[in-house]
């Protein structure tokens, strides 16, 4: 009974659903975490939104130096109601998250 009520409550909700993945298909091409921003843009085209979120201070113990790494978020979609959120740190793709909006 509890499971039925929980499923009924979820079915009626207008929440945003999301999940993370390490690859994204753009047409016949794939992009993966670790790819460079220009490679993603070549394969997927211009995002519908592109925003600089800020910078993050990193420290390289090998070279004993710190540097600021630029953090960006690109959004692609909607594709069948799904938006793809791509996060770049220092020009490298570090996270791909898909979100469906109801």
Where are these regions (language model features)?
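Bacterial N-terminal signal peptides that target proteins for export
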Residues: 1-5
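Hydrophobic helical h-region of N-terminal Sec-dependent signal peptides
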Residues: 6-10
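N-terminal signal peptide c-region/cleavage motif recognized by signal peptidases
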Residues: 13-15
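Residues within mature, well-folded domains
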Residues: 17-102
């Amino acid at each position: 009974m509890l499971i039925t009520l929980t499923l009924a409550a979820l079915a009626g909700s207008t929440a945003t659903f999301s999940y993370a993945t390490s690859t994204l298909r753009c047409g016949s091409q794939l992009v993966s975490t670790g790819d460079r921003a220009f490679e993603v843009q070549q394969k997927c085209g211009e995002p519908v939104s592109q925003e600089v979120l800020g910078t993050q201070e990193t420290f390289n113990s090998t070279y004993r130096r710190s540097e600021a790494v630029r953090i960006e978020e690109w959004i692609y979609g909607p594709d069948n109601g799904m938006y793809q959120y791509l996060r770049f740190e220092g020009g490298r793709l570090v996270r791909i998250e898909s979100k469906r909006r109801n």
